[in-house]
Amino acid sequence: MNIAPEKNCDLCPRLAEFRQANVQQYPSFYNAPVPAFGELDSELLIVGLAPGLKGANQSGRPFTGDYAGIILYSALQKYAFAQGEYEPEKFFVGGKDSFSLNNCRVSNSVRCVPPDNKPTPSEITTCNNFLSNEIAAMKKLKVIVSLGQIAHKSVISIFNRKQADYKFAHGAKHKLENIILLNSFHTSRYNINTGRLSQAMFDAVIGEARNLIA
């Protein structure tokens, strides 16, 4: 049961081709399927969309190096799901920071960076197999936070539920067997700049996750 694709995964030809082009253009980048961050025995799972070109695709760690990570990891630290110093710039010179997660794991619906940050439906479906296996392997999992509608739909699909019965809405809470799914708008710079999401709004979602787990 594979919870992550191989580093040279070619299951999605378009993504593999884009990855290879990035190897040529950005040879110092990670340029491979980005593995999840955090332990499998965690009670909280954050599911994002996909690595950003100059974020996780560069650093090799989810939400590390782009604006979305600042919002996400700030909230996780606030509610004791993370500790240490979040210093993404260290990854770009071959180093690492002291940042770590507590009882939390961060993953993505799609593990490879897609062109224009837009995976196709078939790419989402293909990579969903890894996310499904990952969720199944998290035996202590209590809460999933989906960042954005695609991540939400991926989780609903994994639990074999009808999408129409589980509408995405920021702050919404859904019961999936013995797991609670919380919805949030994605922590992207675009959502922050347009006012769709604020740090306080996102903090409230992570605070709810803490209440459900505590």
Predicted region positions:
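A polyanion-binding, active-site-adjacent surface
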Residues: 1-168, 174, 179-214
